[in-house]
Amino acid sequence: MAPLTRYRADNDHVPLPFVEEYYEQRGSVPGTLLVTEATFISPQAGGYANVPGIHNAAQIKAWKEVTDAVHGKGSFIYCQLWALGRAAKPEVINAEGFDHVSSSAVPINMDSPVPRALTEREIQQYIKDYAHAAKSAIEAGFDGVEIHGANGYLIDQFIQDISNHRTDSWGGSTENRARFAIEVTKAVIAAVGADKTAIRLSPWNTFQGMKMADPKPQFSYLVSVLKELKLAYLHLIGSRFDEEKINFLTDIWGKTSPILVAGSLARDASGLMLRASHPNNAGSVVQKYPNSDVVAVFGRYFIANPDLPFRIEKGLALREYDRTTFYTPMSTVGYTDLPFSEEFQNTIHVGA
């Protein structure tokens, strides 16, 4: 399951009690890998209300209940580590006592507030915060952590020249723009081990004012360096446009470790999701990326179908998702009230 922001934490960024049930439901098919919603690494990394954190004792305790529940179903769960940067809502981050910051003083668009460029000291503190959050995640029982380096958030703001206008050692060249992502990854590895560390990237993303004119050299360099760090996996977000492929990155990574691919997975004419991991299926990730160990990642359909892996395997119809419930703060509606398929429930009864 892909990371999915849902705003189901309390006002102190602690996951609410029913978050445990949500993840337990989606880990009900043994062997499923869940990646949590993006989770703040520190108070200053935030800027949205009702998003969970993983940096204090109360948050660790709440997440421990989640990880225990998922492991009880025979599944696995990684915590996605998040810092917003300029994507933060200024009124929220300011109210919490922190500045609105980014790699550079470059706004998302002409109508957005201008963030303050991070200082050298602040950059070093962020790197430490990622490492601390990673340790906290392992303490909370997570199987590993996924560094959120995609979708126009802080790490992505350093990676891409459209948002990074620095002329010091953190910008100005392909190597320097990649440095923050690399240093964060190395710090997390030092904290919890490479086998528990992953990263998510989105070279073709246009969300939040992103996308370089030509992302290939920048992301090729970054992935070539990350490859040498022997991460647990690489998570890539694909594009809906045929000319914007991610094969240039999967080919670099090869079979170093698994690659998770999210976005634009094919559906057949009847509306059933293709069995995207099956090698004999047209449009499968195996056929698209023959030189890598690639796994399909699903997001929104996992919200509406808590037994999604079972439905895909059995070729069952998928329940359509309801966008209006995606971001309803602190509500169980559209969160823990989605039913399992009758067929899956029958297997549970038989097993019992």
What are these model-predicted stretches?
Residues 2-352:
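Flavin-dependent oxidoreductase catalytic cores
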